[in-house]
């Protein structure tokens, strides 16, 4: 009895001990779990505080992207920094290029060549000498020199190294891309914004023109457009671009106005332009799209009215019709009330082209990729605002048809990489922009612009294979251009780091496919449409409005 009684307390003690130990273990486990939860919660809260809300928004790449049919190569180079005196000529400039002008943009073997990974190395010598070009094996890069004056080779080498990272190779990443955003689910309600939007203080932020990126924005309807009549501006406007004189019946495209994002653009007025350009000269140098911009500007200044007082001063700039030629190398007109001159010079490739044998009408022509047009070398000192462009004539059909032979350093090009048309074009753009930049210190009042590529809109083929652009509803409906950099990559890289400004019109023009001459051309062959040039009045007027705001 005593044994039983004595054992019972002991058992109970052991039992209580075990229960207490189990409770402690459970409490320790609960505390551990709470600590783990607390640590995780702390990490989550800390991460949330350090992460901006914008990180959870969809990236810009989710915006709708429109792929242009026109490819923009991106192999930048820069070279010639010679002074204009190196190439000066005392004789008047006469256009040596083929007189016929069309919208041809053959690509035949060009596209295959441009798919190669290209490498071109430009080695600048001392100022005043033509740079040499050599192929570098094993390196997929182009060394683009900064177009600035240098005293020592070491500084030049430093500049060359600095811009290496800006150079791209090949064509794969060079396709023209336009970033746009849907701004309204109802296209009509968006595009049919009234011109009251212009004066609404809440519609645009009032920031300075210098800070405005005019390439960003949207197209809206303005009841005050167009700025001139396409049927009345016959003094300046070629009939092949005056769609009012054709069989086209829809002209809603004439009423669209470009509205930059977050800033206002100064209204264009002919009288205001002439006052701003008093005793100055505006020069357009480029291809047929440059000529369209020139004719647009003349119509905008005059309001489409006949101006008998305007003087033809073409001979002052060497614009004479060569013997047997169809037209001069350009046109120049002067508004006497302000002594303002507006001119256009035909230079489809923006480089120097000269006959190899001046006595032979059938001779080949040297196409000097590293020399600016002879016109610029001779008349730059007379120009106050310069607008350059090139692009659509860089195809095998043009080169072969005009008997143009690529030259570098004064001799035929032997660099097979540079012979690819995409590389040759970009090489030339960088060369000419670099040369103009080197001239800016010599002409402090000169404002120079390079206009980006005007897009083509051929659908279902090319200009000679059934390509068309019959759309009459603009792609701009309900969309807004948002990209920061130009769709024309080559143009953007060419002007970077120079005093030459970019007149970026590619993206805003890309969403205006309805503005081309299309099938209504009065000179086109049956079945051939013009989806390269624009109806005037039209999109090129906006290019000039932006130019006016920038000068």
From Swiss-Prot:
This is Protein trichome birefringence-like 16. It comes from Arabidopsis thaliana. A motif (DCXHWCLPGXXDXWN motif) lies at residues 530-544. Residues 77-132 are annotated as: Disordered. One of its GO terms (cellular component) is Golgi trans cisterna. It is found in: Membrane. Belongs to the PC-esterase family. TBL subfamily. The keyword Nucleotide-binding does not apply. Contains 2 motifs that are conserved in esterases, but it is unlikely that this protein belongs to the catalytically active pectin esterases. Residues 95-107 have a biased composition (Basic and acidic residues).
